Amino acid sequence: MAIPEFTMRQLLEAGVHFGHQSHRWNPKMAEYIFGARNNIHIIDLAQTVPLMHRALQAISDTVAKGGRVLFVGTKRQAQDAVADAAKRSAQYFVNSRWLGGTLTNWKTISGSIKRLRHLDDVLNSGDASAYTKKERLTLQRERDKLDRSLGGIKDMGGLPDLIFVIDTNKEDIAIQEAQRLGIPVAAIVDTNCDPKGITYLVPGNDDAGRAIALYCDLIARAVIDGISRAQGDSGIDIGAASRPLREDLPAAQATGFQGLSGPRGTPDDLKKLTGVSGDIEKKFNDLGIFHYWQFAELDHDTVLQIGEEVGLPGRADGWVAQAKGLTAEAE
């Protein structure tokens, strides 16, 4: 894998060079504007190309180090592209209304995510029959409302390491929260936007559907490149990793790790570990891992084997240190 390649012709065909009407411009974007045609500002793609490459490299590097990327695009024409790109690259997204405090008040957001998970469990289990039709409808509406806002981040397990934004004017609250927390921001910045505070600025049209689809595709491919690099750095045979384990090998035997038959008391929230989603947590449970202290006691080779077993070899390196910290907090 490598950083995704693209050409200036692709940018032109997608309409990336079209800015806003010249009277709606932000003077701070002057250095990125080539000129004006029919009162429409034309973005200088000779600058967009290297700046996009820089952003793609930063995103790939972030993921290669085990980081999480949050895609943010709540405008109508960006919603589907943002969600599809995030899902395709196993990352996270917000494509409905940004809830104030999503980053800066993560503790409260985590509580809402727990509520969403609880509603999912209730509505998808036999317990739903214990409620009246009206009560089930009320629960379903609450669940749908939470899912629209939090469905794309319910498996994130913590703050992202970088956010990618379409339309910095519309997503200004998200950007402000990221800046307060020191989280890098990669963003498409149109001629009517303020480039201040954007870590990886990419001048471009943030309204055209084709342009947005191109941006999201490039970012998703950069993320996938980072995942591949992480696997390569860990010495994982990516081709072999794509083949299923032999069915006659029990999971514990495949990893050389002896897990527990069940949790000792209340299981810990393993989704707090880097890159761990709800599905990965279930795989840990299948291996007999329910608690932080189990990770804290593992040696380097064993945790890498477990990471390979659950499909996250590139992110396993930091789990032991994280688990030790979480164990100490719990005590």
Swiss-Prot record:
It comes from the Bacteria. GO terms for cellular component: cytosolic small ribosomal subunit. InterPro entries: Ribosomal_uS2 (IPR001865), Ribosomal_uS2_bac/mit/plastid (IPR005706), Ribosomal_uS2_CS (IPR018130), Ribosomal_uS2_flav_dom_sf (IPR023591). Keywords: Ribonucleoprotein, Ribosomal protein. GO terms for biological process: translation. The keyword Transmembrane does not apply. GO terms for molecular function: structural constituent of ribosome. Belongs to the universal ribosomal protein uS2 family. PANTHER family: 30S RIBOSOMAL PROTEIN S2 PROKARYOTIC AND ORGANELLAR, SMALL RIBOSOMAL SUBUNIT PROTEIN US2M. NCBIfam families: PRK12311.1, rpsB_bact. HAMAP family: Ribosomal_uS2_B (MF_00291_B). This is Small ribosomal subunit protein uS2. The lineage of its organism: Bacteria, Pseudomonadati, Pseudomonadota, Alphaproteobacteria, Hyphomicrobiales.
